[in-house]
């Protein structure tokens, strides 16, 4: 940072950088709670507590966050913040860097309406600060109860909120959306009339991931052929960190042929623990002529910076930038989502 941040800004920036670095959520929450508590104080109150050495008397402020606040109030950039800034993100190849620069938005993100950690406004403002022109808000559908999926009524209320925020945040745009579960029979887990109102529909498999390949193939193809489906999310469902999770098995030639036939995009899910689809499958999708959407699946503001990871995977697979739907401006993207299934 070229200027010294105030205590609230420093705490919020640390939380953001911890999110980017995949820190445990409790660590992130500690800094965000401290930032909220400090923001609620009058400047004179905060200075008095600092001068008397009583910063830890502020609710949600412990020894670590008190040190951050003290350094910021003393006119210093907190040492922990400098350390996190120096870590930075992964270096990108030239091709991946060029692709990252071409992206205009992100078509897969979550808020605290489902299993994300931040309000819609905070996610949108973080996306705008990264230079995005738009962010698709794609909270989960009702069947995924573990992720607090939105039933029809909650989704309607969220649409109203997005309308309000778009009026305030213009020209930045929050695109209405959903990450809708692909049910066992290939149908989508939300009411048809609501799906038709959304800007972006990401369809993903979250259950019965160990289905036999023929059944999984039929399930996925049926979902892809649904005219509401715009993007096929994290198609194998694999997890490549920790205990991991093996990828689902399906016939990629049939699945990607269905995507090409319907104009549905294959998502490159940039989450470090997913990096889905694997490179060999992504190359098959490229060979089939599929559109691609490079998304973060962000559940917190700092995770919106993960797009570069997906761009690196796209570069390795030889993805043609003209096929990347979130390299388009919002109007072109919405024209595509409105027409590609017809």
Regions found by a protein language model. Give the residues of each.
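Positively charged, glycine-rich low-complexity segments
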Residues: 117
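Active-site catalytic microenvironments in core metabolic enzymes, especially phosphate/sugar-handling
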Residues: 177-180, 309
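Charged catalytic cores and adjacent phosphate/nucleic-acid-binding surfaces used
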Residues: 2-3, 78-102, 120-125, 131, ...
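Short strand->helix junction
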Residues: 112-114, 299-300
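Ser/Thr-glycine-rich phosphate-binding loops at phosphate-binding pockets of nucleotides
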Residues: 107-113, 134-138
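Long, highly charged, low-complexity intrinsically disordered interaction regions
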Residues: 1-99
């Amino acid at each position: 940072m070229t200027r010294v941040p105030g205590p609230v800004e420093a705490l919020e920036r640390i939380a953001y950088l911890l999110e980017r670095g995949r820190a445990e959520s409790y660590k992130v929450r500690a800094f965000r709670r401290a930032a909220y508590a400090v923001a609620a104080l009058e400047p004179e109150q905060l200075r008095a507590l600092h001068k008397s050495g009583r910063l830890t008397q502020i609710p949600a402020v412990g020894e670590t966050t008190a040190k951050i606040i003290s350094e910021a109030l003393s006119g210093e950039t907190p040492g922990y913040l400098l350390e996190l800034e120096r870590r930075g993100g992964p270096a990108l190849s030239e091709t991946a860097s060029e692709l990252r620069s071409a992206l205009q938005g992100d078509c897969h993100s979550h808020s605290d309406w489902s299993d994300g950690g931040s309000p819609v406004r905070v996610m949108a403002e973080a996306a705008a600060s990264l230079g995005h022109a738009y962010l698709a808000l794609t909270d989960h559908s009702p069947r995924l109860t573990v992720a607090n999926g939105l039933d029809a009524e909650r989704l309607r209320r969220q649409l109203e909120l997005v309308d309000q925020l778009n009026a305030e945040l213009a020209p930045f745009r929050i695109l209405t959306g959903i990450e809708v579960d692909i049910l066992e029979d290939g149908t989508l887990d939300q009411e048809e009339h609501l799906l038709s109102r959304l800007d972006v529909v990401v369809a993903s498999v979250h259950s019965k991931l160990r289905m036999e390949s023929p059944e999984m193939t039929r399930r996925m193809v049926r979902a892809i052929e649904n005219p509401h489906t715009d993007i096929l999310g994290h198609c194998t469902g694999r997890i490549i960190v920790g205990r991991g999770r093996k990828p689902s098995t399906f016939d990629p030639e049939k699945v990607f042929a269905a995507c090409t036939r319907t104009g549905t995009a294959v998502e490159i899910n940039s989450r470090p623990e997913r990096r889905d689809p694997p490179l060999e499958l992504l190359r098959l999708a490229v060979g089939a002529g599929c559109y691609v959407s490079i998304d973060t699946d962000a559940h917190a503001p700092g995770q919106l910076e993960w797009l570069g990871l997906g761009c690196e995977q796209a570069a390795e697979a030889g993805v043609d930038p003209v096929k990347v739907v979130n390299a388009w401006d919002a109007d072109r993207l919405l024209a595509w989502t409105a027409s590609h299934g017809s």
